[in-house]
Swiss-Prot record:
This is Shikimate kinase 1, chloroplastic. It catalyses: shikimate + ATP = 3-phosphoshikimate + ADP + H(+). The gene is SK1. PANTHER family: SHIKIMATE KINASE, SHIKIMATE KINASE 1, CHLOROPLASTIC. The lineage of its organism: Eukaryota, Viridiplantae, Streptophyta, Embryophyta, Tracheophyta. Its cofactor is Mg(2+). Belongs to the shikimate kinase family. Binds 1 Mg(2+) ion per subunit.
Amino acid sequence: MEAGVGLALQSRAAGFGGSDRRRSALYGGEGRARIGSLRVAEPAVAKAAVWARGSKPVAPLRAKKSSGGHETLHNSVDEALLLKRKSEEVLFYLNGRCIYLVGMMGSGKSTVGKIMSEVLGYSFFDSDKLVEQAVGMPSVAQIFKVHSEAFFRDNESSVLRDLSSMKRLVVATGGGAVIRPVNWKYMKKGLSVWLDVPLDALARRIAKVGTASRPLLDQPSGDPYTMAFSKLSMLAEQRGDAYANADVRVSLEEIASKQGHDDVSKLTPTDIAIESFHKIENFVIEHTVDNPVGDSQADSRAQRIQTL
């Protein structure tokens, strides 16, 4: 068994007001903590330490080129306004609950997650990055190489456990986080959103940027697209049922079809974020029929939306 010692905060913040926002602190590479009261955790699991509101504030989003097949973040002012409106509607229903984005590698979870977190006023975390910082290694690929996939998965579960005790977060999970039932236990404390991207689009994105940072796809030789598509197809078959456990499925093919596109690469991350908010709102409304909000709250929300 891989040996390792993790540290975790004994107390974690659970709700964060706008007046007491504080930056998070994460463990350094040599098992040193920068803040907080610490305890030694069980062997072989290096735990992410998270305090207060989460990660560093996300920088303002601007239209720009993207290496993932998306040309811009916002196509127009109208799109940005729609994003803001949908986020305000969803915020009412979320009541501080976290959002966990799941999906295959290259599906845009981090890009879309940053957009969603900024407009919601939430903090954003990439679970892979938290594992890297907790273990003290620069990449997931190196963790796989030096330790093992199982070692990485143990730490990934520990990170998700720590995050699940918090509120007002958007979390981009690793592509394989869904394969462990315990991770669903943690993610079900919030709302899970599956970004469902066609395999062809995923393979094109990954072939374009390379596979060195993706240990499950990295191959010594062969056509990048063909190799990526073959491996992604195998992973999709293994994980398909697990992804379907998500509360919400956001199909990029469906979004593209509604917009009259024949290629999902024509969608912007903002398109995907807007659809995600729409699906989240529908899901929460459907699942709160037996526990509706009070009349005064509903009236207040209706008046607020009408003024937008």
